[in-house]
């Protein structure tokens, strides 16, 4: 009698083990299993930063009309524009880091102008910016040598672009020999 009870207990334990082998999950996709188990959404979210790490670019330009420009642009590691897309049930979040520019202008070896080129500078000096201007990032800035020599001023071209689109804002930062400046938005 004792061996019969032991046999039935062993049989019940064996049936339980064979029924808990995960076959019901093997027939479902990975995504269905994640949803059923209510696992964190971090498995279905991909976050990337562009650029991934700090980036810096320094450019010194000397012109024959006595102007010299020191331009430094670098990644803003705090402020960024987020573009969210959904692809194959995965949420893709791309963080485009904003860039900051610093420009120092010399005329005949004397410093005449220095400023930080960021969103606040354009917001202060340009009236007709798009409503979503905070979604634009500084793409590049460079000395326009031809116009600078022609007008005897330092003219810096600035390109701002909205990530993942063709929307751009082209501006010119015009600096005279006394350090007075003006920003013109090109149409």
Residue ranges and their predicted role:
Residues 1-34:
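Bacterial Sec-dependent N-terminal signal peptides
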Residues 4, 23, 74-76, 108, ...:
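Generic structural motif
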Residues 12, 61-63, 95-97, 148, ...:
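A generic structural signal for short, solvent-exposed coil/turn residues
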Residues 21-31, 39-43, 47-66, 169-187:
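Acidic, small-residue rich beta-repeat scaffolds with periodic aromatic anchors
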